[in-house]
Amino acid sequence: MATRCFWCWTTLLFCSQLLTGFARASSAGGAKEKGLSQTPTWAVALVCTFFILVSVLLEKALHRVATWLWEKHKNSLLEALEKIKAELMILGFISLLLTFGEQYILKICIPEKAAASMLPCPAPSTHDQDKTHRRRLAAATTSSRCDEGHEPLIPATGLHQLHILLFFMAAFHILYSFITMMLGRLKIRGWKKWEQETCSHDYEFSIDPSRFRLTHETSFVRQHSSFWTKIPFFFYAGCFLQQFFRSVGRTDYLTLRHGFIAAHLAPGRKFDFQKYIKRSLEDDFKVVVGISPLLWASFVIFLLLNVNGWEALFWASILPVLIILAVSTKLQAILTRMALGITERHAVVQGIPLVHGSDKYFWFNRPQLLLHLLHFALFQNAFQLTYFFWVWYSFGLKSCFHTDFKLVIVKLSLGVGALILCSYITLPLYALVTQMGSNMKKAVFDEQMAKALKKWHMTVKKKKGKARKPPTETLGVSDTVSTSTSSFHASGATLLRSKTTGHSTASYMSNFEDQSMSDLEAEPLSPEPIEGHTLVRVGDQNTEIEYTGDISPGNQFSFVKNVPANDID
C-alpha cells in the first residue's frame, strides 16, 4: 500500500512539474506571476482534480495488470512488472528531490568561464548571449541574483527540461519493455508448429534409434558445417550473416529439443519444449528490464560526455548495435560448434543427432554474461531513442543537437533496428541456445512438481526431527540431493547438467518459485508420479536417507531406512 501511495505521489509530481514548466514558459516574457492567493479556487480545484485522476488511473491500470499476471501464474512477468514500478519510483524520487531542491540549486553560482565549458551545443554569439541572459533573469523567479561574472549552476528552465527528460525516460521505459517482450513472444510462438510436429509419426520415425545415418548427411550437420567453417574468418562471417536470414530453423529447434530431453528427462517422456522456452524467455526478460547502478552510471557518463564536437551521441548509438550483433554472432557460432562436435565424435548416428551442451562454448564459460551484455545494450538503445524524442520535444527537430539531420535519421534507424533485432532474434535465440549450457534452468519444473518437491523437503525435515537431529539442521548450503538420474546443489537455483537415463526432474531448490502451465503433458490436477530409488544426503552427518516410491503432490512420502553413507554403492 505504501508503494502504491508513493507511486501516485510521484506521478502527481511529474504532472505538476509539466504544468509548472508550461506556466514558466508562458510568463517568460516579463509578466509578473500571480500566486495561489490571486488564483480562482475553481481553477486550483480543477487542475488538482485532473492530476489526481490521471495518477489514480495510471496506478489502477498497473495494479490490474499485476492482478491479471498473478491470476495467470505469470510469476516472471509479475516480477518484471514490479521491477518497472520500482524504477518508476526511483525516477519519481529523483524528480521529488529536484523539486524540493530547486530553490537551493538555483542559488548555486559558478564562474562564467566554467559555465561556458563542455556545452552540448555551440556557444551562442554575443547578441544571442544578451538575449539568453535576459530570458534567464525573467524566468528565474525563485532564485537570487548571482554576482557579476557568475551564473547559476543550472537555470530554472534547465531544471524543468531535466524533469521532462525524466518523464520521457519513465514513459519510454514502459513502452520499450512492452515492445521487447511482445516481439520475443511473437518469435517463440512461431515455434509452436514445430513442437506440434513432435507428436506425429514422422517425428517418431526420425528419432527411432534403429535408424542409422551418416553424421554428415543429417540436416543439422549439413546446415552448420561446410568448407567455410574450417577457416576462422569465414566461420564468423557466416555466423554473422545467419542471424539475418536463418537465426533458428526447424532443424535447429528439433535437434536442441532432442538433446535437452535426452539430457534431463526420461526416454519417451512427453515434454512441451516450446512452453518451457517461453517461460525461460520470461525469466530473461525479468533481468533485462531492470536498471542497475551500473546502468545509471552509464546514463550519467553519457550526460557528461555529450559535448559539442565529441560525437558522443553517435558512438552511444553505435555501441548497442555492435553489442547485439556480437552476441547474436556468438550464439550462431555456438550452434555451429555443436554441429561440428557431432562430426568429431561420431561417424554414424542413431535417429536425430545428439548434441552435447557445455558452458565451454560461451565467453569465459559464463552464459549469463551474454544476457548482461544484452541488458546493457537494450538500456543504452532505449535511452538513445528517449533522448532523441526528448530533444525533439524540448528544442525542436532541427536544433543545435541535430546539426547533421541525415546522421540523426541514420542513428534513429539504427536504434529501431537494434530493438527489433534484439527482441525478435537475439533474445529468443539466447533463450534456446543457453539450454545447452552446463546448468539446467529452474523453469524446467512445472508448478505441480515444484509443490511435490517442497512437500518432500518438509517431510525430510520432519523425519530428521524424529531422528533426534539438532533442530537447526536443515537441507542447507552444504546439502546435496542425489538421485539415480541427476544430481545438483540444493541450496540455490542452479541445477547441474548430467547425462541421464531416467527421471531427472525429481530435484529440489530451496528458493524456488512456482511456475505456470505444466510442460509435462500429464493430468493437470494429478501429475504423473515420479518413480524411482532416491538417496538424500542430510547435513554433514555423513548419513543418507533412502527413499523408494512415488513423488506426487497427493502422496505421503515414506523413507524406508537410514543408511550410512559408506554402506551405499
Curated annotation (Swiss-Prot):
Q: How does it sit in the membrane?
A: Multi-pass membrane protein
Topological domain, Extracellular: which ranges? 1-41, 107-163, 308, 394-413
- Read off the Pfam families from this record: Mlo
From what superkingdom does this record's organism come?
Eukaryota
Please list where the region (Calmodulin-binding) is annotated: 447-468
One CC-aspect GO term: membrane
User: Is Transferase among the key words of this record?
Assistant: no
- Any idea which GO molecular function terms this record carries? calmodulin binding
Those parts of the protein on the Cytoplasmic side are 63-85, 185-286, 330-372, 435-569
Keyword Transmembrane helix among UniProt keywords: yes
User: Which cell locations does it reside in?
Assistant: Membrane
Q: Where are the transmembrane segments?
A: 42-62, 86-106, 164-184, 287-307, 309-329, 373-393, 414-434
Identify the keywords attached in UniProt to this record, alphabetized. Calmodulin-binding, Membrane, Pathogenesis-related protein, Plant defense, Transmembrane, Transmembrane helix
One GO term under biological process is: defense response
Q: What is known of its domains?
A: The C-terminus contains a calmodulin-binding domain, which binds calmodulin in a calcium-dependent fashion.
Q: What does this protein do?
A: May be involved in modulation of pathogen defense and leaf cell death. Activity seems to be regulated by Ca(2+)-dependent calmodulin binding and seems not to require heterotrimeric G proteins.
Which family would the database say this protein is a member of? Belongs to the MLO family.
Q: What is this protein called?
A: MLO-like protein 10
